[in-house]
Every structure is written in C-alpha cells, then in structure tokens.
Amino acid sequence: MKVAYPNIFVVLIGFYGLFFLTVKLRDSAWGLLSTFALTGFMGYTLGPILDRYLGMPNGGEVVSSAFAMTALVFVGLSAYVLTTRKDMSFLGGFITAGFFVLLGASLAGLFFEVSGLQLAISAGFVLFSSVCILYQTSEIIHGGERNYIMATISLYVSIYNLFVSLLQIFGIMSSDD
C-alpha cells in the first residue's frame, strides 16, 4: 500500500509549530497534550517513510535492522552515561557546530548532485543524534534538565532522527542502484 508523504512545507510547519508550542507550554498541563500532539505528528510522518522502505525487496530487514540498531545505540549510550555518571556538557559546542555542518551539507545536497553525499549526511546525523543522546541523558541525570516534557521531546527527536538516518543508510547499502 502506497502512502503519500505529506507536503514538505506541511511537515516543517507542523513539526516546528508543534515543537515551539510544546516548548511554550512545557510548564503547564497543556504541555503534556502538546507533547502527545508533537510525537503523534512525527509518528504520522514516519508512516510513509516506513512504507517506502517496506516496499523494497528486503525492506523488512532494513526496517528491523534500523530499529534494532537504534535501540542498541540508545540503550548503550544511556547506560554509559548512567553508569559512569560523566558530565557530557562539554559536548554542547560539538552539537552546535554539528548542527550547522549538517544544515549546510543538507542544503548543498538539495542543489548539487554529489555521489555519496546522502550517505555522508545520514552518517553525520547518526553521529549527531548519538552525541545529542549522550548530552541530553547527562543533562537529565545531572539536573540540567528538570522539565520532563523538554527531556521527553529532546530525547524523542534524537531517537527519531537516529532511526530515520539508520533507515537511510541501510536502505542505501541494500539497494541495487
């Protein structure tokens, strides 16, 4: 079954609108409802992506591999931070720089047809999301992030990005093109 992916502008407006709404409402009961709306919307946008990969000849393996790897990375990184209790706040600068590098590479990918760029961007997002998970988990256990709504959405977005990036990598590596 082919599920149409929503218009990119609808996705961007929906995500950023719900994200900023959740940040604004984070200290009220409405923030919880906004969190459910944001995560539900992100799940809605994930449906057509999964449909595309499941339509590939080995799509089930690609999706299950990306899911398993995402779970292993998240549990492994979180366990590392929880057991070592290391303060990962020093990663803030790397996260900022990584964001701008990935933004620039993504924009370049829209305009230039460079072989392997999509794979490199996806690998960069895997690294970026992993560093964000380390940083956010450390912030949560060291009291830097005390708001459960912000902790939830920051980790959820990192896990979502990690999963989608791994899907892209496994999809590229398993295609015959």
What are these regions (language model features)?
Residues M1-D177:
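A hydrophobic alpha-helical transmembrane-helix feature that marks the membrane cores
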